[in-house]
Amino acid sequence: MRILSKILFCIAIMSLFSSCYTYKVFPKEYRKLVNNEPKKVAFISNPTDSLKKEISILQSSDLFIFSKDSTAAEIKIKVYPIKEGRRSCGQGTILTMITIGQVPIRFSDIYTFSFDEIKKDVSVKRKYDLKVSQRIWFWDMFVFNKNFNKKAGKALLGEYKNNK
């Protein structure tokens, strides 16, 4: 009985610490950004299972209206795998674990997102650095908006508008 209670306690502590994170988009202006421009109808030319994350980010960006019919689309989009770059190490986690999550830490990561816009045999290569950081803090356990793809979509929308 004691062993079972120790195992359950360890599982509860691990799940508590694994749920204390959230994502933030930088710069702050991108967080509330809304696309008011007319959207083009787009067709993704390479929808594979290995690119599900990238396609979800592109759909979350609200840049295009996606069609499953290639003849109805104004442009075709070829998506490339996202490249993740971690600019910080995990040493800050030690301080957070010692203080039981009361001191927040932030991992500032840069993700390189690239795709091609193909319109009538003219291909335009788009490549953006998405600045999405992960914050680990005890009180983020009560934040339920923890979807990385939506946050990366906001960052993509901001970068796309600023770098047309």
Q: What kind of region is each of these model predictions?
A:
Residues 73, 78-123, 142-143:
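Surface-exposed short loop/turn segments
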